[in-house]
Structure formats: structure tokens, C-alpha cells
């Protein structure tokens, strides 16, 4: 009898555990073809930087920020301290710079899924002080997540859900979404999360596993197939003239004629 009880328990555990799947795509069309007409109650969540858009200058690109943090860490600074130190400068650069859309089909996909009555929102590591510039950047590309009206209990002061964008104030994804899910009055049966970094996709998968939410994590690599924006030498020239951020083309011209000295 004990054997059969154990067997039944194991079978129940296996069938009741939410499914998890990780896929890699080159284009947003691959996401649409598989999930646009999914009847499940799901949330579709987009990362912001390098998924919805990327900085249009080497200096405003996320890779400059990441490489700068790495540089400080080689000097013995902790990752958190480097992030906190560089953030005000990164934010000032965002206010001066421009952005480039990754794929023109993304706004159309968002609108279609919203029109199906599904919840679609964005999730960024960005700090709360970056809310205004983030909203301006999204609006410039006609991207809106304001339809994502998710009733929740009071959120912790470290995170914010503003106009359909979850601001996590974190170096790595996961903790903010965990807090956000904790505050929800009802959870979805499935979460579809799109990010350009696989480690972020895996982190969100762990959050969903803890909540027993079915999960499809999508590693979105479209930006890798676009002409590169971040070029270290160009970023150095732009940093020299950062009081008024110049384009990559202007920086390349200065570099060619050695006028950056």
C-alpha cells in the first residue's frame, strides 16, 4: 500500500508541475507564429533594452554601460558599487542620445496580442529615476503598454509598475518580478518572457517555477544581426564630447582626422 501511495504522489507531482521551455529566435515573427493565438491565460513580457530598442550611439548603447561596469570591476570595485557609480552618467547619456528600433514588427505584435485581451507589459532593470526617459523612448516608437492594468497590493518602494512597465532597479533580472507576482491578486497560467540575454531568461524561469506558472522563455537575438552600434573607439570620442552627444558618423570623422585629441 505504501508503495502505491508513493507512486501516486510522484505521478501527481509530475503532472501538476508547470512546464518550462526555453527557445532562441532570430526574429519576432517566430514568436508571433507560435503564440499569437494561444488560448491560455498568459502574460507576454518584453525586456526593454536591446529587445524593444537599443541606443543609436555607441555611448548610449547598453554595451557601453556593461563594459564600463566590467572595467571598474577589474579595478576591484564590486558590481553593485560600479552600477551605482555609473548610473547617473548613463542616465544623463540616455537623455541626450537617441534610440534605434530592433524590429518594426514588434509594435504590431504588441497591439495584436493586446487586442486579443492578453496582458502585455515590459520589464526593465532600470531604476525608478529612469521612468520619464524610458516612457519618452517608448513613445517615440509608438510603443504603449498602458492596457496592462494589473490590480495588485501595494508594491515595495524599490520597484514600480508605471504605464505597463515594471521598473526593477536591479542589476540582474528576477527579484523585481518575484515581488511583483507576490503582490498580484491573481496569477496567469503561463508567462512568455522575451529577453536578449539567456541568463535573464533562465532567471525568470526560476521565478515562474517557484510560482508553479507555466513558462516559455525566449532568447531574442535579432540585435546581433543588425549593424553594430557599440564600437569602443567611437564611444571614447563621444565620451570626450559628451556635453553634446554626437553621432557615430561624426565621431568616426573626428577619429579619422584625429580631432578627438
PLM-predicted stretches and their roles:
Residues 19-43, 48-167:
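Alpha-helical substrate-recognition element adjacent to the catalytic core
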Residues 3-12:
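Sec-dependent N-terminal signal peptides
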Residues 14-18:
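Sec/Tat signal peptide C-region and signal peptidase I cleavage site
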Residues 4, 37-39, 186:
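Residue-level detector of transmembrane insertion/anchoring sites
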Amino acid at each position: 500500500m505504501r508503495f502505491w501511495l508513493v507512486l501516486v504522489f510522484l505521478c501527481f507531482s509530475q503532472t501538476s508541475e508547470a512546464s518550462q521551455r526555453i527557445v532562441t529566435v532570430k526574429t519576432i515573427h517566430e514568436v508571433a507564429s507560435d503564440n499569437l493565438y494561444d488560448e491560455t491565460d498568459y502574460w507576454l513580457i518584453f525586456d526593454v533594452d536591446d529587445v524593444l530598442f537599443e541606443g543609436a550611439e555607441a555611448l548610449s548603447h547598453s554595451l557601453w554601460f556593461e563594459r564600463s561596469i566590467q572595467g571598474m570591476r577589474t579595478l576591484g570595485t564590486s558590481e553593485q558599487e560600479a552600477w551605482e557609480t555609473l548610473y547617473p552618467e548613463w542616465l544623463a547619456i540616455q537623455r541626450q542620445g537617441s534610440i534605434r528600433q530592433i524590429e518594426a514588427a514588434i509594435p504590431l505584435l504588441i497591439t495584436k496580442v493586446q487586442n486579443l485581451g492578453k496582458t502585455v507589459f515590459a520589464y526593465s532593470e532600470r531604476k525608478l529615476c529612469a521612468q520619464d526617459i524610458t516612457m519618452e523612448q517608448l513613445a517615440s516608437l509608438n510603443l504603449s503598454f498602458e492596457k496592462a492594468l494589473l490590480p495588485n497590493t501595494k508594491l515595495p518602494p524599490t520597484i514600480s509598475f508605471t504605464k505597463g512597465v515594471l521598473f526593477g532597479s536591479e542589476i540582474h533580472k528576477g527579484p523585481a518580478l518575484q515581488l511583483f507576482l507576490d503582490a498580484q491578486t491573481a496569477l496567469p497560467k503561463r508567462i512568455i518572457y522575451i529577453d536578449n540575454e539567456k541568463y535573464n531568461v533562465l532567471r525568470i524561469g526560476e521565478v515562474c517555477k517557484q510560482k508553479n506558472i507555466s513558462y516559455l522563455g525566449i532568447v531574442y537575438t535579432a540585435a546581433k544581426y543588425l549593424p553594430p552600434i557599440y564600437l569602443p573607439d567611437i564611444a571614447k570620442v563621444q565620451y570626450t564630447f559628451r556635453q553634446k552627444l554626437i553621432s557615430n558618423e561624426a565621431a568616426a570623422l573626428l577619429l579619422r582626422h584625429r580631432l578627438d585629441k
